[in-house]
Amino acid sequence: MTAVAAAPFSFKDFFKSFMLVELFKGMALTGRHAFRRKVTVQFPEEKTPLSPRFRGLHALRRYDNGEERCIACKLCEAVCPALAITIESELRADGSRRTTRYDIDLTKCIFCGFCEESCPVDSIVETHIFEYHGEKRGDLYFTKDMLLAVGDRYEAEIAAARAADAKYR
């Protein structure tokens, strides 16, 4: 068995531990940050700017003539990793398909944006609305009519966000 030699005595280490150098370094760091300009945002009164790619509440869009854009291709339903979208469709008299049911369960949705990216006609979009709530679970279950109402109400903001994001697409 070999004996372990004790570490040699060092005045430098003794001075560091005795004089509490690390403590004063920490206090200096705290002191430097204590007098800097505050960056806290007082949320309800002040709002930070949102990115054009911010993903908030979903909306269904319409064409300028008032017809809904969704062609019931069901790509958004297929690509949704959280299985939050439910679509049912039927054929019209002219042979085109349209949705009879388009539901999004926001309690399941992870706001990944895959539904928006997969839509070939830009029907489903995610708005910049993030201030919404529900008092019970069913309040966060959006039907086709509710999604169309959101799209109609915020069409100007949606179009502006799409235009700002166009250079990145």
Swiss-Prot record:
* Class of this enzyme: translocase
Q: What is the residue range of the signal peptide feature?
A: none
Q: Where is the 4Fe-4S ferredoxin-type domain?
A: 61-90, 100-129
Per UniProt, [4Fe-4S] cluster 1 binds at: C70, C73, C76, C119
Q: Which GO terms describe its biological process?
A: aerobic respiration
The record's annotation in Gene3D superfamilies points to: 3.30.70.3270
What does the record say about its membrane topology? Peripheral membrane protein
Q: Which UniProt keywords apply?
A: 4Fe-4S, Cell inner membrane, Cell membrane, Iron, Iron-sulfur, Membrane, Metal-binding, NAD, Quinone, Repeat, Translocase, Ubiquinone
Q: Which reaction does it catalyse?
A: a quinone + NADH + 5 H(+)(in) = a quinol + NAD(+) + 4 H(+)(out)
Q: Which PROSITE patterns does this entry report, sorted A to Z?
A: 4FE4S_FER_1, 4FE4S_FER_2
Its required cofactor(s), as named, are: [4Fe-4S] cluster
State a GO cellular component annotated for this protein. Answer: plasma membrane
The record's section on PANTHER family has:
NADH DEHYDROGENASE [UBIQUINONE] IRON-SULFUR PROTEIN 8, MITOCHONDRIAL, NADH DEHYDROGENASE UBIQUINONE IRON-SULFUR PROTEIN 8, MITOCHONDRIAL
- Family statement drawn from the similarity comment of this UniProt entry: Belongs to the complex I 23 kDa subunit family.
Subunit text:
NDH-1 is composed of 14 different subunits. Subunits NuoA, H, J, K, L, M, N constitute the membrane sector of the complex.
- Which HAMAP family does the entry link to? NDH1_NuoI
Q: What is this protein called?
A: NADH-quinone oxidoreductase subunit I
Which organism was this protein described from? Verminephrobacter eiseniae (strain EF01-2)
Q: Lineage of the native species?
A: Bacteria, Pseudomonadati, Pseudomonadota, Betaproteobacteria, Burkholderiales
Gene designation: nuoI
